[in-house]
């Protein structure tokens, strides 16, 4: 049997991983500007953490979760999304305590798992970065969090991303709309997909989220949830829109957007772009003011988003955005003869200790092959070290682009390599 990676997973190899690291670092620096700190939760959780919070009737729980019973007969699931584990951690670690500064702002970066049909930008193991803010009902929190994602896209140079916005209102608004949607969809029940016929009984808002053609036709003229917002919900949504306008963040109202998770209320949003004539959601989130209480904590407002790294990198590639990834070496040491092996190790280590990126030959190859490696590594400078250089304590350092050379002592290399580089830059 040929051993291969499981379907729907990928190996992120050197070169590609540098792009991932760059995007992750830009995200970290962006989140830090908004006073977010990193949180790391387990890759697997008790099944109930996900099923009860995400929703028993959602596709995630009914079709997509990787769940199993462990050797202690505990029902475990690999995490399919990031919010529920973070909320569980917030409650378990009592981050709601009065001595903890509010709002609590955290971000995460890590793998998520869903059993879906693999396609571009959507794998069974996918990587997500996300943020969660606990303790603020202020609509400014909604807008600040959306603005943070917007700033991240701008920093990365991504264009043609549209913010889709909607409100699910509070519980009363949602219940009123739920009944209106049932009244609208029931006469056309038989024309809905089998999944949506089930959703109509269990959670009719899910029908709006369906990707099936017959369901999309059915909901074209469905009532808008915005017509069922009570005064409190309408005020919150109006303030969110006004603040987005004040920050010059453009958006469109999308009344059919409900998000694929059951815990949202009030503001929900998605950032959507177009790839190969197909819409692609690259970031989505919203407000969830009951989830902390649902996990056994005190009444606590929450707002956050998740962003798929595979999708983000796909967009960067499709838009031709070249990431400023550092791929070159500061120096490559070509080694001639076994007598220079030990000294080559000393020199390359001392240069690394000074903060430079350095490599050397380990394979005893001919000098031409070593120079070719230096070119492949995009080495800025090359040092040729043989037994005669070891005896004299002096080497030539060559600028690999201009071919200019300087002669320096081992002491200069090991104590002040920066000065050596400056000599070659003149």
UniProtKB/Swiss-Prot annotation:
Its main location: cytoplasm. Keywords: Aminoacyl-tRNA synthetase, ATP-binding, Cytoplasm, Ligase, Nucleotide-binding, Protein biosynthesis. It catalyses: tRNA(His) + L-histidine + ATP = L-histidyl-tRNA(His) + AMP + diphosphate + H(+). It is found in: Cytoplasm. Its EC number is 6.1.1.21. Gene3D superfamilies: Anticodon-binding domain, Bira Bifunctional Protein, Domain 2. Coiled coil: none annotated. The keyword Protein biosynthesis applies. It is an enzyme of class 6 (ligase). This is Histidine--tRNA ligase. It comes from Streptococcus thermophilus (strain ATCC BAA-491 / LMD-9).
């Amino acid at each position: 049997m040929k051993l291969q990676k499981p379907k729907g997973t990928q190996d992120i190899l050197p070169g590609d991983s540098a792009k991932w690291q760059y995007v992750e670092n830009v995200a970290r620096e962006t989140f830090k500007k908004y006073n977010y700190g990193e949180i790391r939760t387990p890759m697997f959780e008790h099944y109930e953490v996900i099923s009860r919070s995400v929703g028993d009737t959602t596709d995630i729980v009914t079709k997509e979760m990787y769940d199993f019973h462990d050797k202690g007969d505990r029902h475990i699931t690999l995490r399919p999304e990031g919010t529920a584990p973070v909320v569980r951690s917030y409650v378990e670690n009592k981050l709601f305590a009065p001595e903890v500064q509010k709002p609590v702002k955290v971000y995460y970066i890590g793998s998520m798992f869903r059993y879906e049909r693999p396609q571009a930008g959507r794998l069974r193991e996918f990587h997500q970065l996300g943020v969660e803010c606990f303790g603020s009902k202020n609509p400014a929190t909604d807008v600040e969090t959306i603005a943070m994602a917007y700033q991240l896209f701008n920093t990365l140079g991504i264009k043609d991303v549209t913010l889709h916005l909607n409100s699910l209102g509070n519980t009363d608004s949602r219940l009123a709309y739920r009944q209106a949607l049932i009244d609208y969809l029931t006469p056309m029940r038989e024309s809905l997909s089998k999944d949506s016929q089930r959703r109509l009984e269990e959670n009719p808002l899910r029908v709006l989220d369906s990707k099936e053609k017959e369901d999309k036709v059915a909901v074209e003229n469905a009532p808008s949830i915005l017509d069922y917002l009570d005064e409190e919900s309408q005020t919150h949504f109006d303030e969110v829109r006004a603040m987005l306008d004040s920050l010059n963040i453009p958006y469109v109202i999308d009344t059919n957007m409900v998000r694929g998770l059951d815990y949202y209320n009030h503001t929900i949003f998605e950032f959507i772009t177009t790839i190969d004539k197909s819409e692609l959601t690259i970031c989505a989130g919203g407000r969830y003011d009951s989830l902390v209480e649902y996990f056994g904590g005190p009444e606590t407002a929450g707002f956050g988003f998740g962003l798929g790294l595979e999708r983000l990198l796909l967009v960067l590639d499709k838009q031709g955005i070249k990431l400023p990834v550092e791929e070159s070496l500061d120096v490559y040491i070509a080694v001639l003869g076994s007598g220079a092996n030990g000294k080559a190790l000393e020199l390359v280590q001392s240069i690394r200790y000074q903060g430079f990126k350095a490599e050397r030959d380990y394979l005893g190859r001919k000098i031409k092959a070593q120079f070719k490696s230096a070119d492949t590594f995009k080495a800025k400078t090359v040092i040729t070290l043989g037994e005669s250089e070891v005896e004299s304590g002096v080497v030539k350092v060559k600028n690999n682009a201009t071919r200019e050379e300087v002669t320096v002592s081992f002491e200069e290399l090991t104590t002040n390599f920066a000065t050596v580089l400056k000599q070659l830059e003149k």
